[in-house]
């Protein structure tokens, strides 16, 4: 009876469990040495990790010397403690501290590959981050204009504030190409993005496209939404694994980030 109770409390994971249809990895995983209570329990002998629930979040902890048994790849390596799953690959985990920057670079690379596959002669990806105060100020201005019956309030505010709307604007990628007949690109992070899907469909159907500009919200293709980040931060606080910046603040920043995707054929 005690062993059953210990097993239920400690939730050890064994290599055989990985083949079970009932087992799945959590989106957030931890790579850490076995702790004292698991190391000293007979029910955890030969285990490769364990499951736990921190606040409302299920977390799988993997022992470093057993990580290879899970068949995962880690970015940048397996030396970090906390990882979150890549939204495009369930077997690829990204260090939590690197998560948003990694996905930014990966998506810029994908947009470049899409342009090349579609036979673009020129493309540019401009990365923009909206100021935190801009959303609130814009909303107030629009509401104020509506209250006064000014139909053009939105446009006027947008024009006046455009130069100061963003805290960051940078050219993330730009290239001149020879151009060629389109080849259907393999979509990864943008496989559900309606604008990119429309671009591909138009180009493959030989529509006379010449110049297209799209605004792509990064929050649409990220793996951590603000609601997820709140749960992650609560779990990390419970585990006493709080870093310099909260995941919630990063996710909120991500919700203000955009790619302006300009492409010429």
PLM regions: where:
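Residue-identity detector for glycine
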Residues: 49, 64, 71, 119-120, ...
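Glycine- and small hydrophobic-rich membrane-insertion segments that are intrinsically disordered
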Residues: 136-159, 226-251
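An N-terminally focused, membrane-permeabilizing/fusogenic/translocator signature enriched
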Residues: 1-136, 144
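Polar low-complexity intrinsically disordered regions
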Residues: 1-8, 150-162, 181
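Membrane pore-forming effector domains from diverse proteins
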Residues: 97-135, 156-227, 246-265
């Amino acid at each position: 009876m005690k062993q059953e109770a210990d097993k239920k409390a400690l939730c050890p994971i064994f290599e055989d469990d990985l083949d079970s249809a009932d087992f799945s990895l959590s989106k957030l995983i931890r790579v850490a040495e076995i702790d004292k209570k698991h190391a000293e329990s007979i029910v955890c002998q030969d285990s490769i990790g364990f499951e736990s629930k921190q606040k409302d979040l299920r977390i799988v902890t993997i022992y470093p010397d057993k990580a290879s048994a899970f068949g995962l790849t880690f970015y940048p390596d397996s030396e970090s403690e906390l990882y979150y799953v890549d939204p495009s690959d369930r077997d690829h985990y990204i260090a939590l501290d690197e998560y948003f920057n990694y996905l930014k670079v990966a998506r810029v690379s994908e947009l470049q590959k899409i342009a090349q596959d579609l036979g673009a002669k020129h493309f540019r990806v401009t990365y923009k981050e909206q100021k935190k105060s801009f959303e609130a100020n814009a909303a107030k201005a629009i509401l104020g204009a509506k209250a006064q019956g000014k139909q053009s309030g939105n446009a006027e505010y947008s024009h006046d504030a455009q130069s100061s709307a963003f805290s960051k604007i940078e050219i993330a990628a730009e290239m001149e190409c020879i151009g060629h007949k389109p080849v259907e690109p393999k979509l990864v992070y943008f496989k559900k993005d309606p604008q990119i899907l429309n671009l591909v469909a138009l180009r493959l159907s030989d529509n006379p496209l010449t110049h297209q500009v799209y605004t792509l919200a990064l929050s649409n293709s990220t793996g951590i939404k603000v609601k997820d980040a709140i749960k992650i931060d609560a779990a990390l606080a419970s585990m006493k694994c709080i870093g310099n910046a909260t995941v919630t603040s990063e996710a909120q920043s991500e919700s203000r980030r955009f790619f302006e995707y300009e492409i010429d054929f």
